[in-house]
């Protein structure tokens, strides 16, 4: 979980606030992680604070005056109320916080570039033709530089001119204390799990976060003009396992503390080798099955285990029970005669998605990603935003919508006959 430098010199390790992991990727982007575009992003304490906090409010601005203020070499948020009036809130440097920005833009203010997740996509080209719904400057996370290093999330990010513009059509309003606030077009949704991110976790309620970090119930649809009700007892403070939805991609927030209890990639590799050492066999061909190495996680191997999703019986690939008159991938299991999809099994390699370090005994349906029982049980009950107003459970390793009664199955391996 840690870079070699950190393992060798723990005293020199910079403070890690946490990590953001994009749901739908199994350890890296399909074509590999490059620069600021990757499947996970670690937030470390910066050498020098770059956080900002609100200061002066300019209320009755003409568009020209608003432009003059926002052209200053400091951060500002502009709320356009009408063609004649704009409220500009200036932001000043905050030496106690670090700011990290997330969005689709590749411009320099964005620390973590996020593109739309296409379920099961094998290459970045699969995602390019889709019209993106992720904002170019989607959100910002502000981390306290001093213990306990609290992280808070806010909708919208500052652009290259250090501005955030909320146009006439954006939902915005004046708060009871005379300040301004607003929502971005497609919104930033957050869900904090109950009982943290552990094997006892339960899903929380999805909320929308405003530009100023206030918490609201969801709008009727993603981009509706009318905001939801303010939820005053909840905050924008991220906790281990919080989910952040940017309308096109969902991110999992893991704290440094939470990650220290997560299985390492080495541990997952040891579990893989343990399964393979037991020499599971195909009940039809009697050939030994083996999960391919984590590096080869998207090319079907000849020894790869396959599973009948209706019953969980694990086989090697064979043509038994493959009747042409059946639609699609449905096959009859030779062991119990149940008919259903027959798919290859893949190990879940993204350790940050695991809620425990249990053995890989269960698989998500219909994709065949394998992980611990508690991890499949957890993700199968999490409703993830899909489109503009629907929610469904999905596999965290590939973003495929889960199917079947539970969304996952217990795997039944046959050991060697000798």
Curated annotation (Swiss-Prot):
<dbReference type="GO" id="GO:0070936">
    <property type="term" value="P:protein K48-linked ubiquitination"/>
</dbReference>
<dbReference type="GO" id="GO:0034141">
    <property type="term" value="P:positive regulation of toll-like receptor 3 signaling pathway"/>
</dbReference>
<dbReference type="GO" id="GO:0042130">
    <property type="term" value="P:negative regulation of T cell proliferation"/>
</dbReference>
<dbReference type="GO" id="GO:0043123">
    <property type="term" value="P:positive regulation of canonical NF-kappaB signal transduction"/>
</dbReference>
<keyword id="KW-0808">Transferase</keyword>
<dbReference type="GO" id="GO:0032496">
    <property type="term" value="P:response to lipopolysaccharide"/>
</dbReference>
<dbReference type="InterPro" id="IPR006800">
    <property type="entry name" value="Pellino_fam"/>
</dbReference>
<feature type="modified residue" description="Phosphoserine; by ATM">
    <location>
        <position position="121"/>
    </location>
</feature>
<dbReference type="GO" id="GO:0070534">
    <property type="term" value="P:protein K63-linked ubiquitination"/>
</dbReference>
<dbReference type="GO" id="GO:0060546">
    <property type="term" value="P:negative regulation of necroptotic process"/>
</dbReference>
<keyword id="KW-0833">Ubl conjugation pathway</keyword>
<dbReference type="GO" id="GO:0034145">
    <property type="term" value="P:positive regulation of toll-like receptor 4 signaling pathway"/>
</dbReference>
<keyword id="KW-0227">DNA damage</keyword>
<dbReference type="GO" id="GO:0031398">
    <property type="term" value="P:positive regulation of protein ubiquitination"/>
</dbReference>
<keyword id="KW-0597">Phosphoprotein</keyword>
<feature type="modified residue" description="Phosphothreonine; by ATM">
    <location>
        <position position="127"/>
    </location>
</feature>
<dbReference type="GO" id="GO:0035861">
    <property type="term" value="C:site of double-strand break"/>
</dbReference>
<dbReference type="InterPro" id="IPR048334">
    <property type="entry name" value="Pellino_FHA"/>
</dbReference>
<comment type="similarity">
    <text>Belongs to the pellino family.</text>
</comment>
<dbReference type="GO" id="GO:0006281">
    <property type="term" value="P:DNA repair"/>
</dbReference>
<dbReference type="GO" id="GO:0061630">
    <property type="term" value="F:ubiquitin protein ligase activity"/>
</dbReference>
<dbReference type="GO" id="GO:0030890">
    <property type="term" value="P:positive regulation of B cell proliferation"/>
</dbReference>
<keyword id="KW-0234">DNA repair</keyword>
<dbReference type="GO" id="GO:0034450">
    <property type="term" value="F:ubiquitin-ubiquitin ligase activity"/>
</dbReference>
<dbReference type="GO" id="GO:0005829">
    <property type="term" value="C:cytosol"/>
</dbReference>
<comment type="subunit">
    <text>Interacts with MAP3K7. Upon IL1B treatment, forms a complex with TRAF6, IRAK1, IRAK4 and MYD88; this complex recruits MAP3K7/TAK1, TAB1 and TAB2 to mediate NF-kappa-B activation. Direct binding of SMAD6 to PELI1 prevents the complex formation and hence negatively regulates IL1R-TLR signaling and eventually NF-kappa-B-mediated gene expression. Interacts (via atypical FHA domain) with RIPK3; preferentially binds to the 'Thr-182' phosphorylated form of RIPK3. Interacts with RIPK1 and IRAK1.</text>
</comment>
<dbReference type="Pfam" id="PF04710">
    <property type="entry name" value="Pellino_FHA"/>
</dbReference>
<dbReference type="Pfam" id="PF20723">
    <property type="entry name" value="Pellino_RING"/>
</dbReference>
<dbReference type="GO" id="GO:0042098">
    <property type="term" value="P:T cell proliferation"/>
</dbReference>
<dbReference type="GO" id="GO:0001819">
    <property type="term" value="P:positive regulation of cytokine production"/>
</dbReference>
<keyword id="KW-0832">Ubl conjugation</keyword>
<comment type="function">
    <text>E3 ubiquitin ligase catalyzing the covalent attachment of ubiquitin moieties onto substrate proteins. Involved in the TLR and IL-1 signaling pathways via interaction with the complex containing IRAK kinases and TRAF6. Acts as a positive regulator of inflammatory response in microglia through activation of NF-kappa-B and MAP kinase. Mediates 'Lys-63'-linked polyubiquitination of IRAK1 allowing subsequent NF-kappa-B activation. Conjugates 'Lys-63'-linked ubiquitin chains to the adapter protein ASC/PYCARD, which in turn is crucial for NLRP3 inflammasome activation.</text>
</comment>
<dbReference type="GO" id="GO:0005634">
    <property type="term" value="C:nucleus"/>
</dbReference>
<dbReference type="GO" id="GO:0060544">
    <property type="term" value="P:regulation of necroptotic process"/>
</dbReference>
<comment type="pathway">
    <text>Protein modification; protein ubiquitination.</text>
</comment>
<protein>
    <recommendedName>
        <fullName>E3 ubiquitin-protein ligase pellino homolog 1</fullName>
        <ecNumber>2.3.2.27</ecNumber>
    </recommendedName>
</protein>
<dbReference type="InterPro" id="IPR048335">
    <property type="entry name" value="Pellino_RING"/>
</dbReference>
<dbReference type="GO" id="GO:1905168">
    <property type="term" value="P:positive regulation of double-strand break repair via homologous recombination"/>
</dbReference>
<dbReference type="GO" id="GO:0043331">
    <property type="term" value="P:response to dsRNA"/>
</dbReference>
<dbReference type="GO" id="GO:0008592">
    <property type="term" value="P:regulation of Toll signaling pathway"/>
</dbReference>
<feature type="region of interest" description="Ring-like domain; necessary for ubiqitination of RIPK3">
    <location>
        <begin position="311"/>
        <end position="399"/>
    </location>
</feature>
<keyword id="KW-0158">Chromosome</keyword>
